[in-house]
Amino acid sequence: MEKTLSIIKPDAVKKGVIGQILTRFESNGLRIAATKKIQLSEKEAQEFYAVHKDRPFFKDLVEFMISGPVVVSVLEGKNAVLKNRELMGATNPKEAAAGTIRADFADSIDANAVHGSDSLENAKIEIEFFFSKTEIL
């Protein structure tokens, strides 16, 4: 079974829609193998998003991701990476299909409610960033 990482970002946590988002995953065949609510440090956010360090939005992204708690989860299921990305919708909520997480809960391209791994390779790296093997059941 494939695994992927999901992050419910500070904007969605603040809105109180954690349960609704996790329910969407489960309703669509993704099992929650691990989940925890954490407060990222600036260093952790910089490390996690290091791939974007030379992009103009990097500083704002880091500041946003440390602005409040996040919920990190390992989702497991058939085609988990693709299924999660379909459930999330387009990065820009204005372009996200109706019924997707971002269309329903995101405010902007920056405060876009959720993060999801974009490949199996990145999913493995991202999961290992947040979870030890003993935390994934």
Curated annotation (Swiss-Prot):
Q: Which locations, inside or outside the cell, does it occupy?
A: Cytoplasm
Q: Which NCBIfam families match?
A: PRK00668.1 (NF001908)
Subunit details: Homotetramer.
Q: Which GO terms describe its biological process?
A: CTP biosynthetic process; GTP biosynthetic process; UTP biosynthetic process
The domain of life for this entry's organism is: Bacteria
Active-site residues, record numbering mapped to chain: H115 (pros-phosphohistidine intermediate)
Q: Which InterPro entries match?
A: NDK-like_dom, NDK-like_dom_sf, Nucleoside_diP_kinase, Nucleoside_diP_kinase_AS
Q: What's the family?
A: Belongs to the NDK family.
Q: What Gene Ontology terms describe what this protein does at the molecular function level?
A: ATP binding; metal ion binding; nucleoside diphosphate kinase activity
Alphabetical GO CC annotations of the entry are: cytoplasm
Species: Campylobacter lari (strain RM2100 / D67 / ATCC BAA-1060)
Question: Can you name this protein?
Answer: Nucleoside diphosphate kinase
Q: Which SMART domains match?
A: NDK
Query: Which function does this protein serve?
Result: Major role in the synthesis of nucleoside triphosphates other than ATP. The ATP gamma phosphate is transferred to the NDP beta phosphate via a ping-pong mechanism, using a phosphorylated active-site intermediate.
Quote the record's binding site residues for ATP.
K9, F57, R85, T91, R102, N112
Q: Which cofactor does it need?
A: Mg(2+)
- Which keywords are on file for this protein? ATP-binding, Cytoplasm, Kinase, Magnesium, Metal-binding, Nucleotide metabolism, Nucleotide-binding, Phosphoprotein, Transferase
Gene name linked to the record: ndk
Catalytic activity as recorded in UniProt: a 2'-deoxyribonucleoside 5'-diphosphate + ATP = a 2'-deoxyribonucleoside 5'-triphosphate + ADP; a ribonucleoside 5'-diphosphate + ATP = a ribonucleoside 5'-triphosphate + ADP
